[in-house]
Amino acid sequence: MTIDDSNRLLMDVDQFDFLDDGTAQLSNNKTDEEEQLYKRDPVSGAILVPMTVNDQPIEKNGDKMPLKFKLGPLSYQNMAFITAKDKYKLYPVRIPRLDTSKEFSAYVSGLFEIYRDLGDDRVFNVPTIGVVNSNFAKEHNATVNLAMEAILNELEVFIGRVKDQDGRVNRFYELEESLTVLNCLRTMYFILDGQDVEENRSEFIESLLNWINRSDGEPDEEYIEQVFSVKDSTAGKKVFETQYFWKLLNQLVLRGLLSQAIGCIERSDLLPYLSDTCAVSFDAVSDSIELLKQYPKDSSSTFREWKNLVLKLSQAFGSSATDISGELRDYIEDFLLVIGGNQRKILQYSRTWYESFCGFLLYYIPSLELSAEYLQMSLEANVVDITNDWEQPCVDIISGKIHSILPVMESLDSCTAAFTAMICEAKGLIENIFEGEKNSDDYSNEDNEMLEDLFSYRNGMASYMLNSFAFELCSLGDKELWPVAIGLIALSATGTRSAKKMVIAELLPHYPFVTNDDIEWMLSICVEWRLPEIAKEIYTTLGNQMLSAHNIIESIANFSRAGKYELVKSYSWLLFEASCMEGQKLDDPVLNAIVSKNSPAEDDVIIPQDILDCVVTNSMRQTLAPYAVLSQFYELRDREDWGQALRLLLLLIEFPYLPKHYLVLLVAKFLYPIFLLDDKKLMDEDSVATVIEVIETKWDDADEKSSNLYETIIEADKSLPSSMATLLKNLRKKLNFKLCQAFM
C-alpha cells in the first residue's frame, strides 16, 4: 500500500467546518436560549454558558462596569447586579450544570427507592466463620448486586430520556461517562462473588463487553466502511491483504465483538479466495470462525478445552506450508495467536489499554485475580487518555482504589456519585472509618460530638456524599425531591437520631409547599420526628400566607395552632373593628358560620359542622366571642328588638377586655346614633348607670388610637360631633335625659 492509499484512512481535517470566530453555527430553528448555550470562547474554544438566560448585564462593547452576584439558598434565587450609579436591575443567575428537569427528578426518585428497599443490606458486616454467616453473606451480596444492576438500569433510562433533548449534549456525555465508570465497577466487584464465580461467568463476560464497547463505541461504522473502501483505490490488492483489515479484525476480537468479526471475514471474501488458493489456510480460517462461534462464556473448564483447540490450530498452521503470500500468512497467524491469548500479540493489536485488558480476560486466563497484572501490562503499552474523564476512574477501580473515583464521579453527576458511594459501602469496598464496635460508654466527648455531626469525616465517604446530596436537593426548590432528601437523612446509617432530628428541623420550614397535601406531609414529618416547635413555625408561615391572601379566618386558625395567641387576639379584634365600621356582618360565610347560633338563612352558605370543627380552635372561639355578640346585635337591630339589642351592646361596652379605643367605636357607631339620639327608644335606670360608669372610667380624649379612630368615623358620618370632647358632652346630656325618662 502506498502513502496515498493509507492517507485515505485518515480524517481530512480540511473538509471540516471548524468554528473560526467562536460562534456555533446552529440551525435557524434553534431558540435564542439554545444558541447561547453553544457560544465558545474565541481564544480557548471552551463552551461559554451565559450567567442569565435573556439580556446580559453588560454589553459586549459597552462601558466596563463591576458585576457582582449573590447565591441564594435556592437555585432560582441567585442574582447578579451591577454596582454602578443608576443601575438597579437584578438579573436571575443560572448555575451551569444544575439539572432541574423532570427527568432528573424521576432519576433521583428511582435511585432513592433502590436505596430504601435495600433495608438492612445498606450496611456491610464483616463475614465470620459459620454456615449461617456464610449464607447471610451470600444473600447480602446477591441483594447488593441486584441493587447495583437496578442503579445502572435507572441511569440508562435517564440517559435515554436526555439523549434527544436540544441543548443537553454536555449533560448527555457526562451521564455516559458516569455509566462507563459504573459498568466497570459492576464488572469488577458486583458479579463474581466467592463460590458463584463459575455460575456467574457468563454474566461477567457480558458485563465486561458492555463496559468496553459502550465506553467509546469503537470501531464505528464509518471506520469499518473506510477500511473496506481501501480495495477500491488500491491497485492489485484485496481488502484482506491490507493491514487495516487485520487491525480491524483483531480489534473486534479483542473487544469480544465476535459476530461482527466473523461478518468482516465473510464480507472480505477471504474464504472464497483461500478456497481457490490454499487449502491449509482455508481450513485454518474456517476452523477459527467455528471456534469464535463456540466461544465459551459460561464455563471456565469449557474455556480451557476451547483454548486448547485454538492453540493446536495455531501450532498446526504455523508448522504447515501454505500457498499464500508471506504477508497474508503473517496476518492469519497473528489472528490465531490473538485468539489463543498470546500476550505480545494482544498488546500489539490493542489501540487502548482497556482493549488489551479485555483481551487478556477473554483469551489469556479469565480470572480477576490477575487483573492487576493485566492492567499493568496494558498501561505500559497504552497510557490512559486523560481527555476521557472515565478512564482514570476505571484504572482506579481495577487497582482497588475505590475512594479515588468518587470525586471524579461527583464532578460528572452528584446524584450518581452519592448512590455509587452508598452501594460501594454496602458491598464493603469502602469502609466507614468510625469503628462500630464500641459501646456507647466507650465514646469520648470528641467521638460523641462527631456522632452528632452528620458531616463528620468519621461517618465515612458514603454518608457524607448522601447527606450533602440531600442538602443539594433541598436547594433546587423542587418540592417533589424533598421527600427524597428527608428520606436520605432519615435512612442514614451513621449519626444519632438527635443529629438527624436537628437537621430535619432545620430543613423542613424551607419546604416549598403549595397544596394541602404538602402541608399534611410536612406535619406528618413533624409528628414522626417529634418536632412541635417546627410544627408551630409551619403554622405561623401558613398564617402569614393566608393573611397575604386575605383569608383572615384560616390565618387566625393557623396562628392559633402555632400558639401565637397575641396574633389570634389582634386579628380577631381587627375583624370586630371592620364589622363595626361597616355597621353589619362581614361578608365571610366561614366567619359567620362560626359565630352563628341560629339556623342559616336561605342565602347563607351552609358549611358542615365537621369542617367548622377542623377550622375553629378553642382560642378562636374565645377571641371571636365579641364578634359573635356583635353579630347577634345586628340580627336584633334588624328585627327592631331594641331592648335585647341594647342589652348586647352594653355587654360589649362593659366587657373588661375591650380595648380602650373600641369604646369610642361602639358609642359613636351604635349607642349614640341609635339609642341616645332617638328619644322614643327608652333606657332603664341600670342601663344608663352602666353607660355612665364605663364613660367615666374608660373614656380618654387624649388616647391617640381613640382619636384616630374617631376621625375615621366622622369622615364617613358627618352628622356626628366634630371631636371626641364634643361627643362626650353630648353623651352626658343625652344620658341625663334618658335617666330622667326612666324616672318619669
Curated annotation (Swiss-Prot):
* Keywords for this protein: Membrane, mRNA transport, Nuclear pore complex, Nucleus, Protein transport, Translocation, Transport
Q: Which GO terms describe its cellular component?
A: nuclear envelope; nuclear membrane; nuclear pore; nuclear pore outer ring
Q: Name one GO molecular function term.
A: structural constituent of nuclear pore
Which is a Pfam family this sequence falls into? Answer: Nucleopor_Nup85
List the membrane topology term(s): Peripheral membrane protein
GO terms, biological process: mRNA export from nucleus; nuclear pore localization; nucleocytoplasmic transport; positive regulation of DNA-templated transcription; protein import into nucleus; ribosomal large subunit export from nucleus
Biological function: Functions as a component of the nuclear pore complex (NPC). NPC components, collectively referred to as nucleoporins (NUPs), can play the role of both NPC structural components and of docking or interaction partners for transiently associated nuclear transport factors. NUP85 is involved in nuclear poly(A)+ RNA and pre-ribosome export, in GSP1 nuclear import, in NPC assembly and distribution, as well as in nuclear envelope organization.
The miscellaneous annotation reads: Present with 7920 molecules/cell in log phase SD medium.
Query: What PANTHER family is this protein classified in?
Result: FROUNT PROTEIN-RELATED, NUCLEAR PORE COMPLEX PROTEIN NUP85
User: Of which family is this protein a member?
Assistant: Belongs to the nucleoporin Nup85 family.
Q: How does it assemble?
A: Component of the nuclear pore complex (NPC). NPC constitutes the exclusive means of nucleocytoplasmic transport. NPCs allow the passive diffusion of ions and small molecules and the active, nuclear transport receptor-mediated bidirectional transport of macromolecules such as proteins, RNAs, ribonucleoparticles (RNPs), and ribosomal subunits across the nuclear envelope. Due to its 8-fold rotational symmetry, all subunits are present with 8 copies or multiples thereof.
- Its recorded name reads Nucleoporin NUP85
